Amino acid sequence: MKKQLFYLLLATGVLSACGPAAPQLGKDSVEDVIGAMTLEEKAHLVIGTGMVGTSGDSTVIGTTKKLVPGAAGTTYPIPRLGIPAIVLADGPAGLRIDPIREGDSATYYCTHFPIGTLLASTWNQDLVEEVGKSIGNEVLEYGADVLLAPALNIHRNPLCGRNFEYYSEDPLVSGKIAAAYVRGIQSNGVGTSIKHFAVNNQETNRNANDARITPRALREIYLKGFEIAVKESAPWTVMSSYNHINGTYASENTDLLSTLLRDEWNFEGMVVTDWFGGKDAVAQMIAGNDMLQPGRANQYDMIIEGVKSGKLDESILNRNVKRVLELILQTPHFKEYKYSNKPDLKAHAAVTRQSATEGMVLLKNNNETLPFERKVRNIALFGCTSYDFIAGGTGSGNVNRAYTVSLLDGLKNAGYQIDEALKADYEQYIEAENKKNTLDSSQPFSRFMPVPRPTELIPTTKVLSEQVAKADVALVTLGRTSGEFVDRNVSDFELSEEELQLLKSVSQAFHAAGKKVVVVLNIGGVIETASWKKLPDAILLAWQAGQEGGNSVTDVLSGKVSPSGKLTMTFPNKLMDVASSTNFPMDARANTDVRNKEDKRSSVKNVDYTDYEEDIFVGYRYFASLTAYFINI
């Protein structure tokens, strides 16, 4: 009996020493899980695990590469509490991950869908939702949990470097299209992050610029689209922007992230910073910015010290932790989804080809130039961009795709004949130009920036004569690309001397022979057309149509489909006609200081601060207020 009692007491002691089992996320309440977390675990959970390829105070752990190579960030796992890491990856024209992996013969290319401006030009919410479903499927099947998209900042000025990602100068169009995109993505059981909240309308000094704006303009123009998206699609997350708004960082702004977003709009998801955004981790936690990405060691230290010193009440940190855990509970990684790494890329290519045609805008079409007549078989194809088509912009909005269909390829796929000698001239010229046009590799984020385009090739009189004799019609493509860290130059809005000479020469030669000229605009942002629009017979605004761009444009040119796009941004006669142009950085240099290490702030207009003096009169609202203004198109 004594022996049995001894073993019973021994077993009880062992159980007591082990203590109760730790609560598990998904099995126990979120509150119980938070109650079991150490302060250090809480601090880790609200900051990311680092970003591969960065160093110094930017890296915390750097496990991003171990989950989905090329993804933008991950969260901190706590296995003892059943908390997995989840993956956040860039968009919005498609998932951006590494297509090639070390020691792996498989490829992981994603579909490059049309840019945001083109999708918005469809004015078709059902179509955008279908595109979102396809993108969301790739997010799911490649093992990501949250797509860092859509981007719905307002097209305040034609020169913004990331206008291609954004939808419109109109907040209603922006909000409705964003909501449709979010619904499509999230129908796959993966999340979105509507961005950049808010008033992030220039790339120049975006990490420190102070947007000075009236409450009315803020509400009616720059926040309205976000409000629509929040209320009509319930995005899982919102991404705060880099910039200040009236003197306060967006990621440290309690009125923006808590009072308005949560209390007024009833947003129930998580708020995440843009990568390296903000300065004060404690202020960000207090404001309601729940997660700091990609995560920096000094942010962890600030949060720990903030709680210990009383500057950050632990109940506030618990609130942020709860929102992160509620996000994780929804994700495929938490649900242990067995992703295939094999989405149906062929089906998604068909989606991008078809969807792009609906957003193309026919700006001019004299004498029924388009669609091509059936007798048109031979095409004189001019312009470097015809042979080197632009799928989309650069930076986090780019997609690592398997291919891009050029206009040359699209026309040939449809059975049109292209002169081989002219093709060879262009290909040799483009190859030589591309060797000269390289980025400064010393810049830490140069891979995100746009590569300079080739100077336009002007055909000789002999070449023109040969093409007029051979071809039924002339087609000229003009291209523009843009991306992160730098806004477009004034010269990018206007046509170069070489481009103007090309248009004049081709138009004169072909019109003299009674043959027509078509211009295709493969652009991500508005350009000037007033000075040359009378030269060609037709102008097709193709935007940047994704990886199937050449096929999509050919479908329109041939009459297989009708271009049904509508402009979402005004094409002004001159850049300075735009109300915001006096308060926008012109030809400013790129700034890749994503960590904003410079504490001293100067007072350079339109760089350190930008006055939104046009107030609510953005785009067409301004032009409609004038007594008389003849819009370019």
Name these PLM-found stretches:
Residues Q4-Y7, K470:
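Alpha-helical transmembrane segments of integral membrane proteins
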Residues Y7-S16:
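Bacterial N-terminal signal peptides
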